[in-house]
Every structure is written in C-alpha cells, then in structure tokens.
Amino acid sequence: MLSNTYSETALENARNVAPLLSDAAGEIEAERALTPAVLDAMHDAKLFRLTLPHRDNGLELPLPALAQVAEIIAGADASAGWCLGQAFGCAMSAAFMDKVPAQQVFGTRDAVLAWGAGV
C-alpha cells in the first residue's frame, strides 16, 4: 500500500532528524527560530510536505502517521514540533486551491507556510 510506504519513510526520516533537533534545542530556544541546519534537514526529510496533496508533490500522509511524526519531532524539540504542526495545517489548504496558485505557494523544495498571530 502506497500510504504505508510513505508513512514508514516519514517516520524513519523523523527519527533521523530528531538527534539534530535535540542537539540544536538550546540554540533554537536562544534564537527563537529554527536554525538553518534544522530547516535544511527538515526540508531534506520532506517533513513539511507530509500533508500536501500528491498533485503538489506532497505525501498526503494519513492522520495516525502524522501524529507519530509530530510526536517524534516535538519530543526532540518542542519548537520544531510546533512549527511542523503549523505547517501541517497550512499545507492542507493546498487541497482546496487551484493547481497553479498551490504550485506558486508550495512548489519549491523549501516551501513552508505557517500563520498565526504575530507578537
């Protein structure tokens, strides 16, 4: 089954990224931002593409696998987990967009969208 393969890959990728997140936790907290190395690793692992539709080069991961990925990432660094959770919800919006605007927003490797109140 395709989604099982995607789920296993996503879980493996999350486990592989987790040590980097744990190691960077102090810097992430001090800077109040994910580090460039953390972002690169998360993008390389396609963690921000897990809820994007297949048509937008996403993985459309099922909810149980998403929860497991979120648990792994948040367990390694809560801030990275929060950012990933924001990205999960925002990326789901691509399913309701026409293809061209969705590609404009989510088409590049390092595309990630999050929204919320600015402070």
Residue spans for each PLM region:
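General secondary-structure edge motif
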Residues: 1, 8, 21-23, 49, ...
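Generic structural signal for well-ordered, non-membrane alpha-helical segments
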Residues: 3, 7-10, 14, 35, ...
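N- or domain-start disorder-to-order transition segments that initiate the globular core
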Residues: 4, 11-12, 18-21, 25-28
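Residue-level marker of alpha-helix boundaries and capping positions
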Residues: 28-29, 60
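Active-site-proximal polar cores
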Residues: 32
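Glycine-rich flavin
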Residues: 36-44, 49-119
